[in-house]
Regions:
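Conserved catalytic motifs of ABC-family nucleotide-binding domains
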Residues: 57
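Conserved ABC ATPase signature
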Residues: 36-40
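Short loop immediately C-terminal to the Walker-B catalytic DE motif
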Residues: 67-68, 98
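Catalytic Walker B motif of ABC-type/P-loop ATPase nucleotide-binding domains
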Residues: 61-65
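Hydrophobic anchor residue at the start of the ABC signature
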Residues: 50
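ABC transporter nucleotide-binding domain
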Residues: 78-168
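Conserved ABC ATPase "signature" region
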Residues: 5, 9-32
């Protein structure tokens, strides 16, 4: 509470005590309101930051990589909080974590090298990958060939010696080897939309 009172006073908030009670209840930290910040978990500290942002009841809330560094349980709780806040205001979420988008967003904008590569409904983005996502079981030799021609989403060993299970992307209507179609995900659609390259070269890409 002391931190929020301090920040509220600095920002010219009138009657900060009443508003602070509202926001700490809204973000779910009422029971810990009188504890020291240094005792909070990463997720709790994120909630305090959101509470600070809500002090003046803004119509738009911009959050950047809000779940980075959180454990899975904290991440789920924080996503639910963002979804709740989105019912009353516009929440702009900037993140590289695909699960954050599918769990909290209805629309997405994908930036590639500072330019908009896609903007629209999540469902439209995912549907654009329909018929382009496949699964196959290949030998190590075949894997090298597939990898050179297609984007590999994942590869993992199987219980059968000499076989590798792969999920890959292709813009061909039918791969030239035995494969099964797979229901696309937002990650698949993203990888089809953005040309693949060295992972270090892709750090500038973002999803909002």
């Amino acid at each position: 509470k002391e931190f929020l009172y301090y920040m509220g006073t600095l920002s010219g908030l009138r009657k900060p005590h009443a508003r602070i009670e509202q926001v700490i209840d809204q973000v779910g930290i009422s029971q810990a309101a009188n504890q020291r910040l240094k005792s909070f978990s990463g997720g709790m500290k994120q909630r305090v930051v959101i509470a600070q942002a809500l002090l003046h009841d803004p119509p738009v809330l911009l959050v950047d990589e809000p779940t980075a560094g959180l454990d899975p349980a904290e991440r789920v709780r924080f996503r639910n909080l963002l979804s709740e806040l989105g019912r009353e205001r516009t929440v702009l979420l900037s993140t590289h974590i695909v699960e954050d988008i599918t769990a909290t967003c209805r629309q997405a904008t994908i930036l590639n090298e500072g330019k908009v590569a896609f903007s629209g409904e999540i469902e439209k983005l995912v549907s654009s990958a329909q018929g382009k996502v496949w699964k196959a079981w290949v030998s190590p030799e075949q894997f090298e060939s597939v990898q050179s021609a297609h984007t590999i989403v994942y590869s993992r060993p199987t219980s059968q010696p000499g076989l590798i299970e792969i999920k890959f992307l292709t813009k061909e209507s039918q791969p030239p080897f035995e494969s099964e179609p797979v229901t696309p995900t937002i990650e698949d659609a993203y990888l089809l939309l953005i040309p693949t390259g060295n992972a270090d070269e892709k750090q500038s890409e973002n999803i909002i």
